[in-house]
């Protein structure tokens, strides 16, 4: 059964957002991966703070970005498209994490789907 795997907080001003979440929730942040990307410690699950980006052309991400873990990304992608969803960002590999895609649902919400794989290259 697919389950929530990760959430990301998108921010225009990373230092300001970091201070807010440190003060509000006591979370700590560790630089990881590309510049401007921080893993959040203390959020209770995989979580990150990252610079705001466009997954759908011309529309910056607002709010929290959720990613669902699935056993087979290709099958899930086909099911999402058959249900009326659209690919927002094609499949990419995150080394040591897995294969990731982003989709737009029928209501315009953008979300990620990942097939976790610690051996991904």
Residue positions per predicted region:
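Conserved short beta-strand elements that form part of the metal-binding/catalytic scaffold
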Residues: 27-61, 110-116
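Vicinal oxygen chelate
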Residues: 4-12, 55-81, 83-121
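Conserved active-site tyrosine of GNAT-family acetyltransferases
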Residues: 17-21, 80, 108
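Conserved acetyl-CoA-binding loop of GNAT-fold acetyltransferases
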Residues: 23-29, 84-87
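Residue-level detection of beta-strand scaffold positions
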Residues: 23, 37, 65, 100-101, ...
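N-terminal beta-strand motif that seeds the catalytic metal site of vicinal oxygen chelate
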Residues: 1-19, 45-46, 64-68, 116-121
């Amino acid at each position: 059964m697919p389950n929530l795997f990760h959430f990301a907080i998108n921010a225009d001003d990373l230092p300001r957002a970091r201070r807010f979440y440190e003060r509000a929730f006591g979370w700590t942040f560790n630089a990881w991966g590309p510049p401007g990307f921080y893993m959040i410690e203390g959020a209770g699950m995989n979580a990150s703070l990252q610079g705001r980006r466009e997954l759908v052309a011309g529309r910056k991400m607002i709010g929290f970005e959720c990613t669902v873990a699935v056993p087979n990304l290709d099958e899930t992608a086909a099911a999402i498209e058959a249900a009326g969803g659209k690919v927002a960002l094609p499949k990419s590999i995150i080394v040591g994490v897995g294969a990731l895609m982003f989709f737009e649902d029928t209501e315009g919400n953008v979300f990620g789907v990942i097939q976790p794989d610690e051996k991904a290259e």
